[in-house]
């Protein structure tokens, strides 16, 4: 039964044609502890292969970022851009923040945050060792679990409800153990660094979501993945490998 549910989680989180489309939030939420780190493992391996194949070339960082964007259908990056618009509009009012997130157009806040994230990601991924891509991707996905376990869903948010209703402390513990076990063989230093970055980002994004739209939604969850990814990559790129 876990196998079937896991495949549905994988289909929900990526563009890869694996498994059936989930028919209910329960099918996604109850296996999030397994699906999120597993998706991170696959994306990290694919990105790592690209980083290894193009090591020493000026396009390495661009191709790694492109690989990640394609794999996730750019949905997490879209969430990051929406959050950028919401944070700017949220200074005025909560209604303005919600409206900004639903607006298909990109505002100044989204453009600024999205551009900065891409620039930092391209620069960092062009420098770091290819093997640390797995810990980065695994723990960037793990960031969703503590946010969902502690946070409440934002009003009228399907994605927020998918995770917040079914993710609890046990899932956070299981997901943390799984993420650590999967990441350690690739790089103990990167595993510790990414775990710390994930915790910091989860708390920061959760507080931002509470203050902006009174809860967690899919955009903030997706944004947390990107912020954790970029922060981990920047920190690791500063180490003397």
UniProtKB/Swiss-Prot annotation:
KW Kinase (keyword) present: no
GO molecular function: adenosylcobinamide-GDP ribazoletransferase activity; cobalamin 5'-phosphate synthase activity
Primary subcellular site in the record, as a coarse category: membrane
Topology with respect to the bilayer: Multi-pass membrane protein
Entry's transmembrane regions: 34-54, 108-128, 184-206, 220-240
EC number: 2.7.8.26
Source domain of life: Archaea
Keywords tagged on the record: Cell membrane, Cobalamin biosynthesis, Magnesium, Membrane, Transferase, Transmembrane, Transmembrane helix
InterPro entries: CobS (IPR003805)
Pfam families: CobS (PF02654)
Entry cofactors: Mg(2+)
BP GO annotations: cobalamin biosynthetic process
Top EC class, one word: transferase
Involved pathway(s): Cofactor biosynthesis; adenosylcobalamin biosynthesis; adenosylcobalamin from cob(II)yrinate a,c-diamide: step 7/7
Compartment(s) where it occurs, according to its Swiss-Prot or TrEMBL record: Cell membrane
Cellular component GO terms, alphabetical: plasma membrane
Cited function: Joins adenosylcobinamide-GDP and alpha-ribazole to generate adenosylcobalamin (Ado-cobalamin). Also synthesizes adenosylcobalamin 5'-phosphate from adenosylcobinamide-GDP and alpha-ribazole 5'-phosphate.
Similarity remark: Belongs to the CobS family.
Entry protein name: Adenosylcobinamide-GDP ribazoletransferase
Gene: cobS
């Amino acid at each position: 039964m876990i196998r079937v549910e896991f495949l549905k989680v994988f289909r929900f989180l990526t563009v890869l044609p694996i498994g059936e489309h989930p028919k209910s939030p329960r099918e996604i939420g109850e296996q999030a502890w397994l699906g999120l780190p597993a998706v991170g493992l696959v994306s990290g391996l694919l990105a790592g292969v690209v980083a290894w194949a193009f090591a020493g070339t000026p396009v390495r960082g661009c191709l790694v970022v492109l690989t990640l964007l394609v794999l996730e259908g750019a949905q997490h990056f879209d969430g990051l851009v929406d959050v950028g618009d919401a944070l700017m509009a949220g200074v005025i009012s909560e209604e303005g923040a919600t409206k900004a997130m639903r607006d298909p157009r990109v505002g100044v806040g989204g453009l600024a945050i999205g551009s900065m994230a891409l620039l930092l990601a391209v620069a960092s991924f062009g420098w770091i060792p290819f093997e640390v891509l797995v810990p980065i991707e695994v723990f960037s996905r793990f960031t969703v679990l503590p946010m969902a376990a502690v946070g409440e869903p934002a009003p009228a948010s399907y994605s927020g409800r998918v995770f917040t209703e079914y993710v609890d402390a046990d899932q956070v513990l299981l997901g943390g153990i799984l993420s650590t076990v999967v990441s350690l063989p690739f790089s103990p230093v990167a595993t510790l660094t990414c775990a710390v970055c994930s915790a910091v980002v989860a708390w920061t994004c959760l507080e931002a979501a509470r203050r902006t739209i009174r809860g967690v939604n899919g955009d903030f969850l997706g944004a947390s993945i990107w912020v954790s990814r970029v922060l981990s990559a920047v920190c690791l790129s500063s180490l003397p490998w």
